[in-house]
Amino acid sequence: RQVGYMTQKFSFYEDLSIEENLDFVARLYQLPDRKQVVAESIRGLGLEERRKQLAGQLSGGWKQRMALAACLIHQPKLLLLDEPTAGVDPKARRDFWEQIHGLAAKGLTFLITTHYMDEAERCDRLAYISYGNMLVDGTVAEVIAHAKLITWSVKGPRLGDLARQLRELPGVEQAVAFGGVLHVSGSNEQALENSVSAFRRDPWEWTRVSSGLEDVFIHLMQTAQDNFSR
């Protein structure tokens, strides 16, 4: 009872209401004062107006909120969340994370898997696992520092063509589009400088920037070894 687990795929009964689903979970845990516990769970996650609504009629964001209420109903000390906001809209994601931060402030510990780097940045500590191996762990600042990446941000026309050229050069470990700019990175500063110096001219504008968590994530993905290819 010390651990709660929330699956990525919604795993509750869609032909039951929110209230009925939570009551079912409370029965499984044999919780005393079941009705009061369910009412508090509904109130705590802001589900009062929808408590009679069938789970199958809920949007992705409301389903995740109901699932969180169910996972918290037995008051665990550790909650495992597997891709908790996959497939939900940006507002629902933000609201969900506000709930997470509020619960964490009360002392609840979360272990979360995510592919969203903006969500990873919300966590106190990170661990990057690839093919069953932990490549790096630490705070956001520690993970970024560990990669030792040098990153340039490039603005200008034909960035796709520029990226293809740069990827062929020594020292350029990645050239990846970020919205309307190109991030060019490498861990060997001199080799990177030698390769990109010829391109630091019109029509492109080059700016040295701090490497972000997403730059590091892409770098780690590229260097990770697929254990099925050994």
Segments predicted by a language model, with ranges:
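ABC transporter nucleotide-binding domain
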Residues: E98-S187
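Conserved ABC ATPase signature
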Residues: L54-L58
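Catalytic Walker B motif of ABC-type/P-loop ATPase nucleotide-binding domains
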Residues: L79-D82
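Conserved ABC ATPase "signature" region
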Residues: D23, R27-R50
